[in-house]
Structure formats: structure tokens, C-alpha cells
Design a protein with these regions (language model features):
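Fungal secretory targeting signals
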Residues: 1-23, 308
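Processing junctions and N-termini across compartments
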Residues: 11, 31, 40, 49-51, ...
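N-terminal regions that are enriched for targeting/export leaders
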Residues: 18-85, 89-90, 94
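Sequence contexts marking disulfide-bonded cysteines in secreted/extracellular proteins
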Residues: 36-38, 45-47, 55-58, 98-100, ...
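Extracellular/mature segments of secreted proteins
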Residues: 44-48, 53-56, 64-67, 114-117, ...
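Solvent-exposed loop/turn segments at secondary-structure junctions
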Residues: 72-74, 96-97, 101, 178, ...
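Active-site-surrounding "flap" and adjacent substrate/cofactor-binding loops of secreted or lumenal enzymes
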Residues: 85-90, 99-141
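C-terminal, well-folded lobe of enzymatic/effector domains
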Residues: 144-308
Length: 308
């Protein structure tokens, strides 16, 4: 079945049809043409028994893909209109961990757009040069992706700095280490199209894991009074996804702050099918104390969903 989908995607990509196949399939014009992948064996990342020959077709070596999210209660820039989306967690990123759980970062300085790299120095002692050029939001605007920018400004929110700085950090630190976003994967490459491509992929993955709704389905909602157990959180999310994600907590493990969904991917991160896996990282949340899932400051969030 996936082969049929890939053929359709290739056809749509070749035609550069903004509306897809007679409107049935939408493929962003930034996505690469993946005809070469049709001859590659289909296997989930990190589950291949032979070496991946075309790393544009499967994230290699970073095949343990984490879709990560934050639960923040304020932005610090409310006075500038930078608000959190009501009824939703926010995007952190899409990370290409290696199959053994290790990871690379800032893999291509020629595509380093982070104005404040973190870390500023790599483990080997190399200093990461800070980006002094335009924000990555201008790259998205250049491709006329108003729809994408609008979504990112609603759901991919920074704390204490402009949203675009956060997006630049995530691309520079993580996407440059993800083989399916390599410039070499684009036969008719246009400058910065892989940046837009990555943002599309991040949004696509985020939509697969609606954390707020999955928790609410189990009766777990933000509260300044009620606490929940780690088991309640884990069970609620496993029931919906089939796997136990990483839950991150602050305040000695008693305040829920983030979630990481671990996956293997069949195909590229752009087109691929994500298969949820149990977290390979131990939770930082308490297994004994009650865990707070705090309400947001009312002035820090706004309605972004289309209500009936």
C-alpha cells in the first residue's frame, strides 16, 4: 500500500501540482521528487537489516524520530501578542536520534540559521557561529506559504524570544542532521526549500499526537488544584497511541512540562508512516508524588481552533 502512496506522491511532486492529484492529494511544492526511492526496499528506520543505500529515502542514521511538545503556562511576550493556543500543547520539534539513543546536532554550518545556538560549543570543542541574517520566517514567506506561517505562529510558540528564533534553532540543530532534508535530495533545489519542507514535516508530525485531546479523553485536564499520577498520564497516552512516550517534569518531578513521542519511520520524514514506540528515555516525572498539570495564565492563551 505504501508503494502505491509513494508512487502517487512522486507523480504529484513531478507535476508540482499545488492542489495534488485532482485535488485528492496535496503535496507542498517544496517537497523533493522521490522517484529514486521507488526502487528502495521499504523498511522502518532502525529496523533495516542491510545498509540504507539512498539516505534521502529514510532518515539515516537518525532513524529514531521524536515528535516533541511543550506544556507552557506563559510566553513572556504576551505584551507583543505572542500567546499560547487554547486547548492544545505546543510544538517543540522533530528530532533525529540515532537508533541507539545517541544524537548529533548542528551538522551543517552552511545551513546554521540559529541566532543563539544552544549549545554554543559542540562536544568536540567546535564553536557554533551565531546566525546574523534574516529570520527563517522570511524563508517561508518567500515560498508564499502563508498557511504554514499562520499555523506555526499559533502552535509553535517560543518563550521569552520571537517564535522565528525557536524555529531556526530546531531546524539548525536537528534538521541538518536528518538525511531526508539534505540539499542533495532535491534535484531542482531552490534555496531554503528544505527549511520550509522541515517545517511542514514538523507540523504534520505534531498533528499525529494531539496531546491535550488525548489526555482530556481520559479525564485529565489542566488544574491548579488536582494532581494526577504518572501512571494516569502514561496509560492515557498509551491507550491513544499504542506506546508510552517520555514525560518530562520540573519541580522535582511534580510539574508536567513536556512529552516526547518516539517513532520509527517508514519512508522519509516528509512522507513517511510513523510507528510509535515506547520511550527509550526514563521519565523525569515522579512515580510516587502527585503531578501538577497546571492551568495556563488566562492572559497567556487565546482561542485558535475553529469552533462550531
Amino acid at each position: 500500500m505504501l508503494s502505491s502512496i509513494l508512487i502517487a506522491l512522486v507523480a504529484a511532486g513531478s507535476a508540482k501540482a499545488a492542489g495534488g492529484l485532482q485535488g485528492l492529494l496535496t503535496v507542498p511544492e517544496t517537497f523533493p521528487n522521490l522517484k529514486a526511492c521507488l526502487s528502495e526496499p521499504l523498511t522502518y528506520s532502525c529496523e533495516n537489516t542491510t545498509a540504507i543505500q539512498n539516505t534521502c529515502c529514510s532518515p539515516t542514521p537518525g532513524g529514531l524520530v521524536l515528535q516533541t511538545q511543550f506544556w507552557s503556562t506563559y510566553t513572556g511576550l504576551e505584551h507583543k501578542g505572542q500567546l499560547l493556543p487554547k486547548g492544545s500543547w505546543t510544538i517543540h520539534g522533530l528530532w533525529p536520534d540515532n537508533c541507539d539513543g545517541s544524537f548529533e546536532q548542528y551538522c551543517d554550518f552552511s545551513r546554521q540559521f540559529d541566532p543563539a545556538p544552544s549549545p554554543a560549543v559542540l562536544p568536540n570543542g567546535t564553536t557554533i557561529p551565531a546566525w546574523k541574517g534574516p529570520g527563517v520566517d522570511t524563508f517561508v514567506a518567500k515560498f508564499k506559504r502563508v498557511d504554514l506561517l499562520d499555523y506555526m505562529n499559533k502552535y509553535w510558540i517560543n518563550q521569552g524570544a520571537p517564535n522565528a528564533d525557536f524555529w531556526a534553532h530546531e531546524f539548525s540543530k536537528h534538521a541538518t542532521c536528518t538525511s531526508t532534508f539534505d540539499v542533495a535530495c532535491y534535484a531542482d533545489y531552490k534555496k531554503n526549500q528544505e527549511v520550509v519542507d522541515f517545517f511542514d514535516a514538523v507540523v504534520r508530525a505534531f498533528k499525529m499526537f494531539p496531546t491535550f485531546d488525548m489526555l482530556a479523553a481520559a479525564g485529565i485536564v489542566p488544574s491548579n488544584k488536582t494532581t494526577y499520577t504518572l501512571d494516569q498520564f502514561q496509560t492515557a497516552l498509551k491507550t491513544q497511541t499504542g506506546a508510552v512516550p517520555y514525560l518530562g517534569c520540573g519541580k522535582n518531578g511534580t510539574v508536567l512540562q513536556e512529552v516526547w513521542y518516539f517513532n520509527h519511520v517508514l519512508g522519509s520524514e516528509q512522507f513517511g508512516h510513523f510507528k510509535p514506540l515506547d520511550s527509550t528515555t526514563k521519565t523525569s516525572c515522579s512515580s510516587t508524588a502527585g503531578i501538577h498539570y497546571y492551568e495556563r495564565t488566562p492572559s497567556s492563551e487565546h482561542e485558535v481552533r475553529i469552533l462550531p
